[in-house]
A protein has these predicted regions:
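ATP-binding N-lobe of GHMP and related small-molecule kinases
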Residues: 1-102, 106, 114-124, 156-158
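Alpha/beta catalytic cores of group-transfer enzymes, especially the acyltransferase/condensing modules
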Residues: 126-161
Length: 161
């Protein structure tokens, strides 16, 4: 079992300049820090005795045979992106509710990617972890968010991006 603890963040200056549509034309800079509130992901391979191959637990519980059947968009896209089809059980717990404005969805995505890369015994740099999370949420899921959330979640602490 792998357990990740990924921080939530507070943006102090420059929020909005991290949107691709802005920084590609004008540049951008963001000052943010992570706080002592976290997203926890517990992930483990699911033994083959169960009728389902994937169990995802968050505010809901999902059971399915294939990742494409998941309703949770970030979890579905992470499993698809990493091409994981082994039996898998994932539990999410957070110190704060979703939509808190503190980058919770990005912390979830970074934490899940980190857990699954670790389970696969694949090292990934913090930069690449943040970039994968950006690709998933901004490009594939087309969420209207900037990049600071993913970088803050991956690197933690006080940062200028």
């Amino acid at each position: 079992m792998i357990i990740t603890r990924t921080p939530f963040r507070i943006s102090m200056f420059g929020g909005g300049t991290d949107y691709p549509g802005w920084y590609r034309e004008h540049g951008g800079a963001v000052l943010s820090t992570t706080i002592d509130k976290y997203c926890y992901i517990n992930a483990r391979y699911l033994p083959p005795f169960f009728e389902h191959r994937i169990r995802l637990v968050y505010s809901l519980i999902e059971f399915c045979q294939h990742s494409s059947e998941l309703d949770h968009p970030s979890a579905r896209e992470v499993l698809k992106f990493l091409d994981i089809e082994n039996g898998l059980e994932i539990h999410y717990d957070g110190d704060l509710p979703g939509r808190s404005g503190l980058g919770s969805s990005s912390s979830f995505t970074v934490g899940l990617l980190n857990a699954l890369h670790t389970m696969s015994r694949k090292y990934i740099s913090l930069h690449d972890l943040a970039e994968e999370a950006c690709k998933l949420e901004i490009e594939l899921l087309q969420k209207p968010i900037g990049k600071q959330d993913h970088y803050a979640a991956a690197y933690g602490n006080l940062n200028v991006f």
